[in-house]
Design a protein with these regions (language model features):
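Non-catalytic, solvent-exposed segments at the cell envelope interface
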Residues: 2-323
Length: 323
């Protein structure tokens, strides 16, 4: 099955950076959101905002000596029982994205990895890549992704709960989108319940989460297409001036449900860097795969190697897709 190239939405505004990362269309920067709330809580918001606006928060200061920065962006949630009690905080991941920020060449390249991709998980044998987080948390997922991409060094991790998505959409006042077909799906273990009618609808946070996560009878690629379609709808929503009155609530939702290895000052620097890029300086692709056993997907090795080189993830031509 041919894998079409996936184009994510492009960062144009500071606030859009939050959604670009958090909702999976190819981003990595929620710096403004996290940085703003962090400094506000410390009582020094004015200093942080001034530094951001004037450009004092620069990558070379936040990441000394770094030419490139590779970030693993993960969308995950808790597993729950039939009574909606959390039974496992290290759930399978629904979204896996590797984004590389190139400070020298002034660009951001990102690679999304389908969650059903079959890989070798260190010390656990073969399995779908989305199970690595459940088996060993962020550390094992980082190791698995690094091995998959030719021992690529991953510098930082951002893990976003789907609760952040749900609450942020509610804070926006919902999003209008055309639902392509009847969608019904119930998963108590993953706390996912979808019941949508076809046609143009205004979705609240829970409905929107169901729309972007719905996968029953669909392939991983259909789900990715819906996620990107939804993000275009979010972008349209953000053009409404009245929405900006809701910014504090949306940012608060992102902060409450996001974990990252980066400092807030570093996130601010990334947001500033991303804000200055044009559409042509941002590229998003999907790892080339083909149908495998059952519902698993197998990496197309030659195509994957070529694509990863094109994205500039490797500093030399000696690497190749390993396993």
């Amino acid at each position: 099955m041919a894998t079409p190239q996936r184009r994510g939405a492009r960062i144009r505004r500071v606030f859009w950076a939050l959604f670009w990362l958090m909702f999976w269309t190819g981003g990595l920067v929620l710096g403004t959101a996290l940085g703003y709330l962090h400094f506000a809580s410390e009582g020094t918001v004015s200093r942080a905002v001034v530094a951001y606006i004037t450009g004092e928060t620069k990558p070379e200061n936040a990441f000394p000596g770094k030419r490139k920065l590779t970030i693993l962006v993960v969308g995950a949630d808790e597993n729950r029982d039939n009574r909606k009690r959390v039974v496992d905080s290290m759930a399978r991941t629904d979204t896996i994205l590797v984004a590389q920020v190139d400070f020298v060449n002034q660009r951001i390249h990102a690679l999304s990895i389908p969650r059903d991709t079959l890989v070798r998980i260190p010390r656990h044998g073969w399995g779908k890549i989305n199970s690595a987080h459940a088996l060993g948390g962020p550390r094992l997922l980082v190791e698995t992704v690094s091995n998959l991409l030719g021992n690529l060094q991953i510098d930082h991790v951002v893990i976003v709960s789907y609760k952040a998505f749900e609450e942020a959409i509610d804070a926006l006042g919902g999003v209008t989108i055309e639902v392509e077909k009847r969608m019904v799906y119930h998963d108590n273990w993953g706390d996912l319940h979808v019941d949508l009618q076809p046609g143009v609808q205004h979705l609240n946070g829970k409905q929107a989460l169901g729309y972007v996560r719905y996968r029953h009878s669909d392939s991983d690629f259909h789900r990715i297409e819906r996620q990107q379609k939804f993000m275009r709808a979010v972008k349209e929503r953000l053009k409404d001036p009245s929405v900006w009155m809701r910014v504090p609530q949306v940012l608060a939702a992102g902060l409450r449900h996001t974990r990252t290895t980066m400092e807030f000052e570093q996130l601010l620097a990334l947001a500033l860097f991303a804000r200055q890029l044009s559409d042509e300086q941002i590229r998003t692709e999907t790892l080339p795969v083909r149908n495998g056993p059952g519902t698993a997907l197998l990496v197309k090795r030659e195509e994957a190697t070529q694509l990863i080189r094109e994205l500039g993830f490797w500093d030399t031509d000696t690497y190749s897709y390993a396993r």
